[in-house]
Amino acid sequence: MAAALQRIEQLSSRVVRVLGCNPGPMTLQGTNTYLVGTGSRRILIDTGEPSVPEYISCLKQALVEFDTAIQEILVTHWHSDHSGGIVDICKNINNDTTYCIKKLRRNPQREEIIGNGEQQFIYIENGDVVKTEGATLRVLYTPGHTDDHMALLLEEENAIFSGDCILGEGTTIFEDLYDYMNSLNNLLKIKANIIYPGHGPVIHNAEAKILEYISHRNNREEQIISLFRDNFEKSFTVTELRTMIYKDVPENLHKMAEHNLLLHLRKLEKDGKIFYTTTPVKKWKAVL
């Protein structure tokens, strides 16, 4: 069972967590949104889901409690549990205030619309710095979970806001395992002290958590490589591989297992370790 989190909690002298009030299997206790800084105007990281009045109420309460206002909004990635609350915040905080809303571009680029289109994202890039009183945030491009995912390094604390790249509990999902593993390794190089995740409790041993994530994926990958190594002359469909790799997975999870397996296969293909043929059906085989 996920650990209970307070709806509003001061985590450090410059970080306040406001829970998104949207608990669920994918969001754990809810989306973590953060007010960052020490002054009368602070940066809001992520916005929760649309149409959650409890969250707007909590955010208003936090702004009053800490005698501050929103300077601007940073969105870690496009998923609706992180970007969906933008319109509600703009409408209900300070009477239709138009905030500066920043994120990374989708890759490949595509049009992104906020609400009815009255507001637009301001696109930032890897390495950009966003400042407010008491806080300096450096943008870290961390694709894998999504193509536009960013983490943020809070330089004053050597802490990472990880979005959904790393969660406080359990593991995350991803679109591209090759990019995701590169992102984990890049975050590891920072040698951060703390991780403020997009869901779940604060992670106080950042290095150990990142290594745990890397190990989890490497173990599955090694299992797949071993199967190809032991059957070097053979080629396999994804379904055939699933029956050997995920032997104990119930039938209702077969599609998800095959999806995860396919992400591993695509990474191994990028690594030059396997390839596939499509005649008569798509099959994967070890590289000679």
UniProtKB/Swiss-Prot annotation:
Residues bearing PTM N6-succinyllysine: K273
Molecular function (GO) terms listed? RNA endonuclease activity; single-stranded RNA binding; zinc ion binding
List keywords of the entry alphabetically. Answer: Acetylation, Endonuclease, Hydrolase, Metal-binding, Mitochondrion, Nuclease, Phosphoprotein, RNA-binding, Zinc
Q: What does the UniProt entry say about where the protein is found?
A: Mitochondrion matrix
Positions bearing N6-acetyllysine: K102, K282
Cofactor(s) essential for the protein: Zn(2+)
Instruction: List modified residues, type Phosphoserine.
Output: S235
Q: What is its main location?
A: mitochondrion
Its EC top class is hydrolase
Q: Name one GO cellular component term.
A: mitochondrial matrix
The entry's Zn(2+) 2-binding residues are D81, H82, E118, D164, H199
According to the record's subunit comment, the protein's assembly and interactions are:
Monomer.
Sum up the protein's function in the record's words. Endoribonuclease; cleaves preferentially 3' to purine-pyrimidine dinucleotide motifs in single-stranded RNA. The cleavage product contains a free 3' -OH group. Has no activity with double-stranded RNA or DNA. Required for normal mitochondrial function and cell viability.
Domain of life from the UniProt record: Eukaryota
Query: Coiled-coil regions in this chain?
Result: none
Species this chain originates from: Mus musculus
Write the Enzyme Commission number(s) for this entry: 3.1.27.-
Homology family = Belongs to the metallo-beta-lactamase superfamily. Glyoxalase II family.
Q: Which residues bind Zn(2+) 1?
A: H77, H79, E118, H145, D164
The free-text cofactor remark is: Binds 2 Zn(2+) ions per subunit.
State the protein's name: Endoribonuclease LACTB2
